[in-house]
A protein has these predicted regions:
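Short acidic, glycine-rich surface-loop motifs adjacent to enzyme active sites
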Residues: 1-2
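A short C-terminal boundary segment appended to hydrolase-like catalytic domains
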Residues: 60-175
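Conserved beta-sheet core of the metallophosphoesterase superfamily
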Residues: 5-66
Length: 175
C-alpha cells in the first residue's frame, strides 16, 4: 500500500501552494501518512489515502479503511496541526440465511473487530482464507510502519524537555 510518484508530485504541488493538510481517498486501500516540506519550508501533513470506509470489494486490502484524526489549533502565532493519528476500520458484510444478498453491511473500528466477526464475514464464508483478524492486524501494522505518526509527539516531547531543562537551569541560577 504505497503511494505513487504521481500522488507524491501532486501532494508536493499542493504543499508548495500553501496547503497544510491533504486527505486522499481514491485507490481503495490505506496508504501511508507523511509530512512533506514545501519550497518555503512550511510543512504539510498528507494522508495519501484512507481507502474505503465501506465497501463490498473482495480483498483484505479493500476491507481495511483508515480514519484520519486531526486537531487543528488556532493560536496567536497562527493555525497549525497540533495532533494527528490514523485509526483503522473494517468493512464487515454478511448474509442472513433468508437472503440471497449481503444484507448486513457495517463498519467496525479494527480495535473492536473480533475473530468471530471475521469468521462470519462474507469473504470468509465464500472461502477466502486470507481474510481473518490476524491478516487485518498485520496489514495495519505494515501500513503504520511506513507512517510519520510519532513525529508530532516527538516534537512535543522535545519541547517539554527544553522547557524542563530551562526550568531546571533557572531554578539552579536562583539558588
Amino acid at each position: 500500500m504505497d503511494y505513487t510518484q504521481e500522488q507524491e508530485r501532486q501532494a508536493q504541488f499542493l504543499a508548495d501552494n500553501g496547503v497544510d493538510l491533504i486527505i486522499g481517498s481514491y485507490p481503495h486501500v490505506v496508504e501511508p501518512v507523511k509530512w512533506i516540506t514545501a519550497e518555503n519550508g512550511d510543512r504539510t501533513l498528507v494522508y495519501y489515502s484512507l481507502g474505503n470506509f465501506q465497501s463490498i470489494q473482495n480483498t483484505v486490502e479493500n476491507m481495511l479503511g483508515g480514519q484520519a484524526n486531526v486537531t487543528i489549533s488556532k493560536e496567536e502565532d497562527g493555525t497549525h496541526i497540533s495532533d494527528y493519528s490514523l485509526d483503522f476500520v473494517v468493512t464487515h458484510y454478511e448474509q442472513r440465511e433468508s437472503s440471497e444478498y449481503y444484507d448486513i453491511v457495517t463498519t467496525y473500528p479494527l480495535a473492536d473487530y473480533t475473530s468471530d466477526l471475521a469468521a462470519r464475514h462474507g469473504m470468509s464464508v465464500s472461502g477466502n482464507e486470507e481474510f481473518n483478524l490476524a491478516s487485518l492486524q498485520g496489514l495495519s501494522s505494515q501500513i503504520l510502519s511506513k507512517c510519520d505518526l510519532d513525529e508530532s509527539k516527538e516534537q512535543d516531547a522535545s519541547k517539554d524537555e527544553l522547557t524542563d531543562e530551562s526550568t531546571d537551569e533557572s531554578t539552579d541560577g536562583e539558588n
